[in-house]
């Protein structure tokens, strides 16, 4: 059965970008189904207005309760039972790869609410949203791009969505570390060579090299991640070798 993903959005055209690449192929293969609902379709105001001035004053406009509530209610009825509603907001919990793995493992329909303007009426969040997530400590013009990022990351974790079974498992953050470097043909270009170990065909040595590089890249670029990963004695040895090779104390 296809995983059903939905988006409440004022700009459904933006979400159409998900129909390309890996995510598009997953849709074509029937692994996932994506629908959009526009709150304007449930607006009783002139010109399908869905926003109004904030109580208490202040700049900008706020998305109104009524059309959002009606859109969410309709979407959830079409997505049937076992549907989780997610609001994408800078105020939400910052999503990590482990969070995405847990969400994907639940195989639960997901309805994303993409806000616009200054935000949405708080009563929607407090009474009709199950979880609030953020991509990070920055602000976007709307939640559509955040929803697409979330959807892309979820689809990558669906078995069969990628061309190779191990592709998702090698992604950065899947094991708490950054991914190892990747190379392709030619073996030499502009005086730059592919590491010899990758050309030798010794899979055990290649695996060891990739693990060392993964540990090393994490140490160089995201040392904070190493504090959260339980390293084996072999990992510690590989990391020590990497540090020595890169000018750190041996």
From Swiss-Prot:
Positions bound to S-adenosyl-L-methionine: 115, 135-140
Catalytic activity field: guanosine(37) in tRNA + S-adenosyl-L-methionine = N(1)-methylguanosine(37) in tRNA + S-adenosyl-L-homocysteine + H(+)
EC number in record: 2.1.1.228
GO MF assignments: tRNA (guanine(37)-N1)-methyltransferase activity
UniProt entry keywords in alphabetical sequence: Cytoplasm, Methyltransferase, S-adenosyl-L-methionine, Transferase, tRNA processing
One GO CC term, this protein: cytosol
Annotated disulfide bonds: none
Cell compartments where the protein resides: Cytoplasm
GO biological process: tRNA N1-guanine methylation
Record has S-adenosyl-L-methionine as a keyword: yes
Pfam families for the chain: tRNA_m1G_MT (PF01746)
Chief localization: cytoplasm
Subunit comment: Homodimer.
Family: Belongs to the RNA methyltransferase TrmD family.
Job description of the protein: Specifically methylates guanosine-37 in various tRNAs.
Name by which UniProt lists this protein: tRNA (guanine-N(1)-)-methyltransferase
Naturally occurring in which organism (per UniProt): Legionella pneumophila subsp. pneumophila (strain Philadelphia 1 / ATCC 33152 / DSM 7513)
Origin organism lineage: Bacteria, Pseudomonadati, Pseudomonadota, Gammaproteobacteria, Legionellales
């Amino acid at each position: 059965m296809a995983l059903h993903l939905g988006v409440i959005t004022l700009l459904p055209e933006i979400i159409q970008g998900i129909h390309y690449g890996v995510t598009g192929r997953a849709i074509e293969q029937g692994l996932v189904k994506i629908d959009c609902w526009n709150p304007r379709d449930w607006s009783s105001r002139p010109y399908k207005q869905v926003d109004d001035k904030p109580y208490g004053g202040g700049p900008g406009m706020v998305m109104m309760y009524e059309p959002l509530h009606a859109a969410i209610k309709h979407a959830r009825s079409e997505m049937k039972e076992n549907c989780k509603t997610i609001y994408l907001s800078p105020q939400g919990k910052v999503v990590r790869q482990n969070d995405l793995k847990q969400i994907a493992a639940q195989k639960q329909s997901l309805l994303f609410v993409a806000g616009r303007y200054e935000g949405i009426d708080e009563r929607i969040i407090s009474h009709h949203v199950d979880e609030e997530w953020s991509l990070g400590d920055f602000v976007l013009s709307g939640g559509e791009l955040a929803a697409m990022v979330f959807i892309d990351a979820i689809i990558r974790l669906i078995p069969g969505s990628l061309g190779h079974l191990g592709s998702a498992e090698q992604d950065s953050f899947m094991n708490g570390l950054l991914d190892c470097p990747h190379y392709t043909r030619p073996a030499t270009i502009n005086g730059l060579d592919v590491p010899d170990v990758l050309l030798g065909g010794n899979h055990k040595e290649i695996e060891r090299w990739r693990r060392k590089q993964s540990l090393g890249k994490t140490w160089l670029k995201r040392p904070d991640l190493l504090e959260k990963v339980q390293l084996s004695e072999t990992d510690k040895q590989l990391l020590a070798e990497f540090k020595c090779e890169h000018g750190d104390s041996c």
